[in-house]
Design a protein with these regions (language model features):
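N-terminal mature-domain "stem" immediately C-terminal to a signal peptide or N-terminal signal-anchor/transmembrane
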Residues: 1-6
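Charge-dense polyanion-binding interfaces
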Residues: 7, 11
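Noncatalytic, helix-rich "gating/capping" subdomain that lines the substrate-entry/channel surface
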Residues: 12-307
């Protein structure tokens, strides 16, 4: 399928056999921008710097919390691990879920005493960041401070988030909370104001699979006394937000750690990487187009009947 899409989208880039659908026409424009490697090289890191400087300029925990909703609506990093997806008990209804922050290492087991792979992977991650962050004008002292704080917070986080094995036990993850009870777990976060600005109302309930995170870690993490740690994670998140869109050197460098984890020896060719990046916001439209092109009406009817 990937080779087919490379062929088809290559034709679209050359102005051949262009789709009539307006959404797909926007995909063609977006893909053309993402695949303009000369323009990406010329721009360097300039497109990333406004976000990085905005995050650097945050002056306090109160300043941070006052901008949570604005960051959420703009797709900027804000360390708010919430999502909307179907209710386990009623798949026809979408509900709010309270997840957890992500770990650096692949699973909590890598943080256990005696695990030799954990420190090895963490060293690879840190080395990658020490090469990557200078590209965004972070000084050597800033980089050390950010990485020291992020790694320390990550080690503490690992004590409270679910392991991969625990996450697989779906029947044990359904913990509904009344909204008032949930927001009381993190009293320093203005969650009522956050959700009112983001969705126009406060939720009435929330499903919390990551109870340990919210009960034992989040109250300490989301606090004014922990601002320096939060700020470090935000600055790192701001830098990483742009890596797939910038120069080829940065794209390849930013994938070193993930390639180590997955055992992939070489980075993907830039043409394939650009297509994958462009496909993300248009996946549904492209899927419908592919089905219409490759499935006969009879095959479509057969699938619909089975569903």
């Amino acid at each position: 399928i990937e080779n087919l899409m490379l062929d088809i989208t290559g034709k679209w880039q050359r102005g051949e056999e262009l789709p009539e659908d307006s959404i797909l026409q926007n995909f063609v424009k977006y893909h053309k921008m993402v695949a303009d490697f000369d323009a990406r090289e010329a721009a360097g890191v300039a497109p990333a710097m406004p976000l990085i400087n905005e995050i650097k300029a945050l002056s306090s925990f109160e300043d941070y919390t006052s901008k949570l909703a604005a960051f959420e609506l703009a797709g900027k990093p804000n360390l708010m691990p919430f999502g909307v997806s179907p209710d386990f008990m009623n798949a026809q209804m979408n509900v709010l879920w309270g997840e957890a922050l992500s770990l650096i290492l692949p699973d909590t087991t890598y943080y256990e005493e005696g695990n030799e792979k954990g420190p090895e992977l963490l060293a690879i991650w840190r080395q990658m960041m020490e090469k990557l962050l200078p590209k965004f004008d972070f000084s050597e002292a800033e980089i050390k401070d950010i990485l020291d704080k992020v790694i320390a917070a990550d080690a503490e986080l690992a004590k409270y988030v679910l392991s991969n094995e625990e996450k697989s036990e779906y029947n044990k993850l359904y913990h509904p909370y009344e909204w008032a009870d949930f927001k009381a777990l993190v009293p320093e976060l203005p969650l009522d104001a956050f959700f009112t600005e983001v969705i126009g109302q406060t939720p009435d309930k929330i499903i919390v699979p990551e109870e340990r995170f919210w009960k034992e870690f989040a109250p300490k993490f989301y606090s004014a006394t922990n601002w320096e740690s939060i700020h470090a994670k935000l600055k790192l998140g701001a830098a990483l937000s742009w890596t797939l869109f910038l120069t080829e050197e940065i794209r390849v460098l930013s994938g070193e750690y993930s390639r180590t984890i997955t055992g992939i020896p070489e980075p993907r060719p830039k043409e394939k990487a650009a297509l994958s990046l462009a496909e993300v916001p248009y996946s549904q439209a492209l899927g419908l187009w592919y089905a219409g092109e490759k499935f006969s009406p009879e095959a479509k009817a057969d699938v619909e009947h089975k569903v």
